[in-house]
């Protein structure tokens, strides 16, 4: 199994959610996060004072899928989240040794 984590722009969440549904993903976890990469922060002016915005708002989408579905999921996220501008985000792929559904005790692929 693979855990796929994608850090994306918040306004792309609905597109990514729809794309994941289209490739057969049945559940996702979404977290509002802040961070920066090459995009860095920016400066804003408010009531005559200058403020540095170090961390930019992003959304982290997490999904665990069987190995056979991983490439389709990665491609779906990539295509749905891409704007072509700096700050589109990152995708991380991790191995998952075990998944357990707490309610039923199902393990492995049956738990996801």
Model-derived features: positions:
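Positively charged, small/polar-rich N-terminal and surface patches that mediate targeting and assembly
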Residues: 1-112
């Amino acid at each position: 199994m693979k855990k796929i984590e994608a850090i994306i722009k918040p306004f792309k969440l609905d597109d990514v959610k729809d794309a994941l549904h289209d490739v057969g993903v049945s559940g996702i976890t979404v977290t509002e996060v802040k961070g920066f990469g090459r995009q860095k922060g920016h400066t804003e002016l408010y009531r005559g004072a200058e403020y540095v915005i170090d961390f930019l708002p992003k959304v982290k989408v997490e999904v665990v899928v069987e190995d056979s579905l991983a490439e389709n999921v990665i491609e779906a996220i990539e295509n749905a989240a891409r704007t072509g501008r700096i700050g589109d985000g990152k995708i991380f792929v991790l191995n998952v040794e075990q998944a357990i559904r707490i309610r039923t005790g199902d393990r492995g692929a049956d738990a996801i």
